[in-house]
Amino acid sequence: VISVVLVTWNSARYLPRCLAGIALQTIAVELIVVDNASSDDSLEIVGDGVRVIRNATNRGFSAAVNQALAVARGQYILLCNPDAYLTPTYVQRLIAALEAAGESYGAATGKLLRATGDAIERTDLIDSKGIRFTRSGRHFDVAQGEINVPGETNREVFGVSGACALYRRSFLNAVAIDGEVFDEDFFAYREDADLAWRGRLFGFRALYVPDAVAYHVRTVTPEVRRVLAPVINMHSVKNRFLLRLKNEGLYLAARNAPFELTRDLIALAAVLTIERSSLPALAWLWKNRRRIMAKRREIQRRRVVSDRELAHWFR
């Protein structure tokens, strides 16, 4: 069984095309929809015959995915955003690639191309080929905004974007912390990078499969930060620090210190001046410092890969 997890929150405008792509997959899948208290027609569009978990409030992306994982039957789990469209062979090609790569590969992504509009109209621009990190602790989608070039082969990447990610169930079970696969403290945004980093620490790898193609409408990017809702920016600030506090070892922290400190000072200056709506992020981090450190201790205790082995991914 292959499980497809779809988290909705006022996603009606994208759902018809997204659901059509899932229905056209060349391999049978079970679809699990978790709705975070949508006020639009999302659930009506999903319709009958689909397992739906209805939340009375918006519990956040991470918690919603964990809810779906608790009932999913698949040995493979595809996480799909409502604003994504899968080509028919997407799931089948990713599974075949992971099977060939071996158990050390816990996650895979196809080539995500940029899409636009409610109808998820296709373009030839890259949206994501995976996740990469810089020495400043920032993470980006590999090749985002570049022109698509055919003829690529499968290759290893640091991690995969949660927009259209395939995970082995065995990988998700192995990296869970206190029963949570996706850390619910993240609520939304950067949780896929957190899972990717944790997976690396626990000895797993990730695969980019260019022959598996999907399309994704990218709505949250650094370029549009100033027009995003304040709550989005608040979670983004909170999670950029939470990501490192949990996963970064002392060697990487020392190696990357000049770059991270520069970036942190810029972010803090912005929060204290032009983006004061994100101040609650800093308060949250302080208030929850003991829980954060408890998670850090558990992750660092269970890690099997050293910072020195991971350092080449941060560049």
Listing of model-derived features with the role each one plays in the protein:
Residues 20-29:
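Short, acidic, metal-binding catalytic loop of nucleotide-sugar glycosyltransferases
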Residues 21, 35-44, 57, 87:
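A conserved acidic beta->alpha catalytic loop
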Residues 55-72, 80-82, 93:
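Glycine-rich, basic loop-to-helix element that forms the pyrophosphate-binding segment
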Residues 77:
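Short aromatic/hydrophobic "clamp" motif used to bind/position activated sugar donors
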Residues 87-127, 133-134:
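Conserved donor NDP-sugar-binding/catalytic core segment of glycosyltransferases
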Residues 131, 135-140, 146-169, 188, ...:
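A recurrent flexible, glycine/aromatic-enriched loop bordering the glycosyltransferase active site
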Residues 158-213:
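A short, conserved alpha-helix in the catalytic core of glycosyltransferases
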Residues 205-293:
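Active-site-adjacent helix/loop segment of glycosyltransferases
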